[in-house]
Structure formats: structure tokens, C-alpha cells
Design a protein with these regions (language model features):
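Divalent metal-dependent catalytic cores for phosphoryl transfer on phosphate-bearing substrates
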Residues: 1-109
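Charged phosphate-binding loop/patch that engages nucleotide di/tri-phosphates or the phosphate backbone
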Residues: 109-128
Length: 128
């Protein structure tokens, strides 16, 4: 996924973006699964992630801000979306200095994923 995680723009980032009409081109470049996760990261209404964190049994679903629909996800896709979304934010927050922006939600995502995700959250937010 790498550089493509926000290729279509996100709820918060609307800088350089490609139109979703070019999804097929992106799929050809990075593969179907990576493109789907990139799209989901771009399309998700961030608040819709949190309602899934109350039960690890599912079903898992997010609100798609681009098409206006609810998208159901497998546990694997939900976890991978969380990884991408959390890593993206943890990379941005030191530059943006938005330490309070959805902090509790990002902590819950890190706790859900555990391991390196939680360690990274704690390291990035240490002292803030």
C-alpha cells in the first residue's frame, strides 16, 4: 500500500488526490487487496470505526463518505484498516501537533491491535 494509503483523499486530508474513477488503474499498480484497503482508508468516516471496537465478534461495518453507504468488513479487513489508519495518524500527529484530535479513539484502536500498534501509540504520545 505504502504511498497509496490516502490516494483518494481522506476525511481530513484533501491535498493531492486521484479521482475514485481511477481505482482500476491503482488496482493494476498495487493489487486488488492493497487498493481496497487504500480506498477504505480514504472513504471511512472516522467516527464509524469506533462503533466496531465494542465487540471483537463483529459484524464489522464502516460508513463510506464517498458513496454514502455502509460497507461490511471481515475481521481481517477491519484489523488491516485499523493498522493503516492508525499508522497514518501516528506518522502525522507529531507534525500536526493535534495531540487531542480523537486521541481516545486512536488509543482504543491501538489497544484493539495490541503489540507494536500499542507500543507505537504510547511512544508517539509520550509526554503529550
Amino acid at each position: 500500500m505504502g504511498l497509496y494509503h490516502s490516494i483518494y483523499g481522506t476525511e481530513k486530508f484533501q491535498g493531492f488526490t486521484l479521482s475514485v474513477e481511477r481505482r482500476a488503474e491503482i488496482r493494476t499498480l498495487i493489487g486488488e487487496r492493497a487498493e481496497r484497503l487504500s480506498y477504505l482508508n480514504c472513504a471511512v468516516l472516522r467516527a464509524s470505526i469506533e462503533r466496531n471496537l465494542d465487540s471483537d465478534k463483529g459484524p464489522f461495518a464502516i460508513d463510506d463518505r464517498i458513496c454514502g453507504e455502509v460497507v461490511e468488513l471481515s475481521r481481517e479487513d477491519f484489523d488491516d484498516l485499523l493498522r493503516v489508519h492508525l499508522c497514518d495518524w501516528l506518522e502525522q500527529v507529531p507534525r500536526s501537533q493535534e495531540w487531542t484530535y480523537r486521541r481516545d479513539a486512536y488509543r482504543r484502536m491501538a489497544e484493539w491491535l495490541g503489540g507494536v500498534a500499542l507500543e507505537s501509540f504510547e511512544q508517539v504520545y509520550a509526554g503529550h
